[in-house]
Every structure is written in structure tokens, then in C-alpha cells.
């Protein structure tokens, strides 16, 4: 079934990015997704790069008919930091969802990344360096609402946290934390909001006036990083450096060094793409092999202050 015919059969998805190709083999119940070499080297928020988000939106629509999803992509000539992050995302998708796999033509690239980088060790996260800006922030922007949510009693409905803060850096480096050793894009790469509740870690991807499917890809990526920090210990912090107290990072560090039982990832939004339904979120949680990772949604009403819904 070609792309046009297949899209006509979907609910809540009128079109896909032009640089994402799909084909559905009805007889074998396999959905094929194709991504071009430009998209794998761009920010994962962009529609054409957010393969995870589109896969879930499509699969949840047709889960009775699809048994396998195969992702293929054109390998870029220059493998930049975005591409290395893309390989990590593919690897983690395959680890968490048994019906997903890269195409045969792309397996070698994934295995090389896994053997030479992911399981080779010496992967480090960066620390926060400076306090975030607090003055002259425009009202009704994501930065504004991010600060409005810095309240342990007003971050998730009917939930009180021990501590919460924002802008947790998630730059990944090999061997050493500096510009020359960056593995993924690191500049402004950060989890919008985080919180600790007993032995639970909560992370939040905040959006305002932004209904892109890429929010799924972003949240999953941050969940995978936290999983590799807290559960698998494939990523760690450089203990040779002093643990800063900026934005309560010392409290975060202390909590994740203990036994975190569950990691929650929350879509904190005023609105969502129509394909991102509660049924889709349930589907992600049901299909995910690691039941210690749970995705949730929290909507809010954006005014000068925020109100959870």
C-alpha cells in the first residue's frame, strides 16, 4: 500500500512530512518507514526527524494490522552529532519495542555505534554551569511557563514532590566533558523540568503553542538518557569535578545515586497534536519492555499563571 493510500486510512493524521516515506506490506503486516540523509542530521524536534513520534502515531492507529515496523535511512556522508544521536535513538527504540528494527542496510551502522560507543564506556553527562536567566523573560513563552511551574505542589496534578527544578543539562560526551569530546549536540540540550518524589524521578517536556509530533521523540530521548544514568549506568557524571548546587543539581545527583525505582516522563502541554491521544500514551507504556519507565500527559491552561487541568 503506497503512502497516499495508507494515509487516507489513518485517523488524526492528514499528512506526513514530505521527507518521510512510508509503505505498508499488508500481506506481511510490516510497516516500512524511510528517512532521508538530511533528516537524520537535524534536530529531533523537526517533523521530518521525529521518526519515533510518527511511528507511534501510525502504529497506534493500525495496531491490529501491523506486526513489525522497519526503519531505513540514507546514511549521510558527514556523520555529525545529530546523526550520532539519531543512531542512539534507533538503538534505544529497538531495545524497548520488540516490533521495531532498523533495515538490513542500516544494521551495520547501528552495530558499529553500539560496539564502539554505547557499550564501550566512558560516556559522561555535563553539569549545569550557570544559574538560568530570571529577568526580562517574555510572558506566555515556554521559558516563562517553565519558571511558573517551579513549584513542587503545582507541577503534576494531585502530586507533591520533594524537590523540583528546571534546565537539567543532558549533553553527552566521550572520555571527557569538553567541546572536542561531544558525542551528541550539547549546547542548550536540557530537560525542561525535573522532580524527585521519594525514589521516583520525574522529567517534563514542556510545550506552549506547539503541537508537533516531535514532543514524543524528545521525551523518549530524555527518558533513555535517564535510564542509562539510573538503571544501566552506561552514562555517568565525572566524579573528579565538584557537584554544583546550581538549580538544586546536588539534590538531583544525590537522588539518582540511590536506587531510583521508576522514571516518569511527562508531556506538559497546553495542547497536543490530534494523533497524540491518551490511547497512544497507553500504547507506548504497554509496549515498552522496561516497565520502570512510564509516560504521562499533564495539560495546563496558560494564563499569566498556570492552572493544571
Where are these regions (language model features)?
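Charged, terminal alpha-helix-loop-beta segments
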Residues: 1-309
